[in-house]
Amino acid sequence: MCDDVGVGRIRPTVLKMKKMCETKERLLQVGFDLIWDSSYGSVSVDDICKRAGINKGSFYHFFPSKAELVVEAYEEHWREKRPAMDRIFSPQSPPLERIQNFCRMIYAVQKEKAEEYGHVCGCPYTSVGSELATLDEKIRARAEHLMNAGSKYIESAIADAIREGSVTVKDPVFASVTLQSLLCGMLVEARVQNDLKVLENLEGTVMKLLGAKAVAA
C-alpha cells in the first residue's frame, strides 16, 4: 500500500519531467531547422515558438536568449550526427572509402534538405558561423569548434591513407584543413546558386585534391 502511494506521488513528477524534456528537445530541433532553412537574423523567438507550438514562457524557461538556444541546438545536432560520422570513418574501412562515403553523405543530406525546404541549405555550421562571426563570439566559437571536430575525422582518414600510400599528399593536417575549406566553399556555392549540381562532383574533386591513386567503386 505504501509502495502504491509512493508510485502515485512519483509518477506525476516523472511525467512532468518527461514533458519538459520533450518541450526543450522540440524547441532545439525547430530552432535548428528554421535557422538552417533561412538564417539566424530572419528567425525570431516568436517564429520558433509558433512552429514548435510552444509558448514564449516555456522558451525562456529553458533559454535566456535565442543565441543560447542556437549554441545548444548546434551541439545537439553534432551529438546526433556523431554516430554516423563514427560509422563512416571507422578504421575498419579503407581510408579512401571513408572519405568517399563522407562526400556521399554530404550530397545525400543536402539533397534531402533541398527536397524538404525547397532550396539548397548548405552547411549549418558555416552558415550561422559566417553570419554571426563578428556579432556573437559564443556562436562563432561554437561553429568553429564543431567544424574542427568534423575536420579531425578527415585528418585521421588522410593520415591512414598517407601511411598506406594511397594518396600523394604528405601532410595530413594541411590536407585536412585544405579539404575542409574546399567542402565549405562548395557548400556555400551550392547554397548561393541554389543548385545541387555544384556538389555532384564533390567526391571526384576531393580525390583529386588528395592525389588519390586508387578509388573504390
Which role fits each region the language model picked out?
Residues 23-31, 48, 73-77, 81, ...:
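Generic hydrophobic, amphipathic alpha-helix propensity
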Residues 26, 34-73:
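Helix-turn-helix
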Residues 97, 101, 134-162, 204:
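Amphipathic alpha-helical packing segments from all-alpha helical-bundle domains
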Residues 121-127, 170-189, 205-208:
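Hydrophobic alpha-helical segments that form the core
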